[in-house]
Amino acid sequence: WKGERFDLAKILDGKLGGGVRCSRLFWERSLSPEAREGMNAALESDVCVVCVGTGAVFEGEGWDRSEMRLPKCQEEMILQIASLNPNTVVVIFAGGAVDVSAWQDSVAGILLAGFCGERGGAALAEILTGEVNPSGKLSETFPLCLEDTPSYGTLNTPLVSRYEEGLDVGYRYYDSYGIPVAFPFGHGLSYSDFDYSGLKVDAEGQQAKVVFSLKNVSACDGKEVCQLYIHPLNAYVYRPEQELKAFAKQAVKAGKTGKVAFTLTAADFAYYSTAKDGWTTDDGFYEIRIGASSRDIRLKALVKIADGKLEFVKEVPVVEK
């Protein structure tokens, strides 16, 4: 996006009724004396909002950054401001995963803005001032380091990108191999906290209805993106550890409880068989997992498929040899 730029400081100033001060730091390889002097304003501020990131200088269509970390001068700026004011929030503008490990524990919060366009300033101001409760979730995994990505060995290969991870694309790769990550697929915080409970599965014939309770245990109205994953317990062929099959954003008022429902069919348990040249569903046991992310599973239940029909079971029977 290369349209009209927005002035986040001006928008925040209007929402807060004045008193917002802004020090502007442009692309520099190191922090200038003027920039260092400007950062001292952090001592006199209630909250500091530090906007950092990449952009067309670092990444774009058909090319990418050489590393996941922010430019060194930006990391230095974050750490210095945070040392002066612990109430520091960092807003990141970037087109992909960013390594925040060098300063994550030094700041009060991180807001990932992506490249949010001409109305991005107004949207970010609404979130930062609490007018809007954020409810977004990551649609990708943030790895701990570049070397953990499955495509690491083929970076900078002209015209060729080899998907050697096979079925384990994206979050499936990290989950199937148990690789620790910085922020998992589906992760996202808000000003609310939610409890998951009371999972019930009504499975009969070709469908399974999955219902559970979602309670907002905070003092702030909010929305939660609930996710449903399926894990095959006795797959006949190689399959990923778990696969996302459904998700829903549920609004729940502070202190209240809502119901979330998903409907699964036998097709949701299927995989593509090269031997049969088509989609097939194997008989066996499957675990239904409900979570706030792929690494934050809150509820589990079992279903059995026999002759293409779904059935709820309490446990997998033990076969004595």
What are these regions (language model features)?
Residues 219-236, 242-244:
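Short acidic, flexible loop segments centered on an aromatic residue
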Residues 263-294:
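Short, surface-exposed ligand- or partner-binding patches at beta-edge/loop junctions that are enriched
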